[in-house]
UniProtKB/Swiss-Prot annotation:
Molecular functions per Gene Ontology: imidazoleglycerol-phosphate synthase activity; lyase activity
Family: Belongs to the HisA/HisF family.
Protein's name according to its UniProt entry: Imidazole glycerol phosphate synthase subunit HisF
Record pathway: Amino-acid biosynthesis; L-histidine biosynthesis; L-histidine from 5-phospho-alpha-D-ribose 1-diphosphate: step 5/9
Chief subcellular location: cytoplasm
NCBIfam families assigned: hisF
Lineage: Bacteria, Pseudomonadati, Dictyoglomota, Dictyoglomia, Dictyoglomales
InterPro entries, per database record: Aldolase_TIM (IPR013785), His_biosynth (IPR006062), HisF (IPR004651), IGPS_HisA/HisF (IPR050064), RibuloseP-bd_barrel (IPR011060)
Length: 252
């Protein structure tokens, strides 16, 4: 059994790390390189770095920012935002990313999942899925930074991305994001029932108990932003709590 992972998320606009609520009301919280280094020192298992406006604005990837952040980072780095094709993936991996995360590109051209998995291996491909609840045990997939509904049912999509060769799922509840009231646990349970891929829970972590509940359900990693950016908890505090609750985490 692998140790559960604690992953700080750095949503960026340029070199600035930002945080909002349900993907809006964005404010700057720090510098990407400085925060990545700080979280690594604290014991983060991975870092996720996302350019949150690239797809919405039709921009390319932020290779220069990735190069800067990766240059002094030794934990795995997952990078996403603005990826449109295999060449974008190649540039980001060359810049120092260990994994790439695709969302909008995967929905607009599902074949890109197969292409990336074939060219670089499933182990470096994370498919990010942003959803909003639309009924009882029903969620709709959104793209373009959570702004555009697709009409695609989440359950159908998670099954398809696994079949096409994704290596991991980063699942975000837009409804819960930034509200600090807990993950959408019903959504996480649904994902685990429909897919065998490693699952990263995202959107809504506000307490140590929130993290524990998600990991207890069976997710492989918890992603959080606000609780780390605003100093609610440190990564050592999170890991100490989880260890005491019987969750296997890596301690430095």
């Amino acid at each position: 059994m692998l140790a559960k992972r604690i992953i700080p998320c750095l949503d960026t606009i340029g070199r600035n790390v930002v945080k909002g609520t349900s993907f809006v009301n964005i404010r700057i919280v720090g510098d990407a390189k400085e925060l990545a280094r700080r979280y690594e020192r604290e014991g983060a298992d991975e870092i996720v770095l996302l350019d949150i406006t690239a797809s919405e604005e039709g921009r390319g990837t932020f290779v220069d920012v990735v190069t800067e952040v990766a240059s002094e980072l030794f934990v795995p780095l997952t990078v996403g935002g603005g990826i449109k094709n295999i060449e974008d993936v190649r540039k980001l991996l060359k810049a120092g990313a260990d994994k790439v995360s695709i969302n909008t590109a995967a929905v607009e051209n599902p074949d890109i999942i197969n292409q990336i998995a074939s060219e670089f291996g499933s182990q470096c491909l994370v498919v990010a899925i942003d959803v909003k609840k639309r009924g009882k045990k029903s969620w709709e997939v959104y793209v373009k930074g959570g702004k555009v509904p697709t009409g695609i049912d989440f359950k159908d999509w998670i099954v398809e991305v696994e079949k096409r060769g994704a290596g991991e799922i980063l699942l975000t509840s837009i409804d819960a994001d930034g509200h600090l009231s807990g993950y959408d646990y019903e959504l996480l349970e649904c994902a685990l029932n429909y897919s065998n891929l490693p699952l990263i829970a995202s959107g809504g972590a506000g307490s140590l108990e929130d993290l524990y509940k998600a990991l207890k359900i069976g997710v492989d990693a918890v992603l959080a932003a606000s609780i780390f950016h605003f100093g609610t908890y440190t990564i050592p505090e999170v890991k100490k709590y989880l260890k005491e609750k019987g969750i296997w985490v890596r301690l430095d």
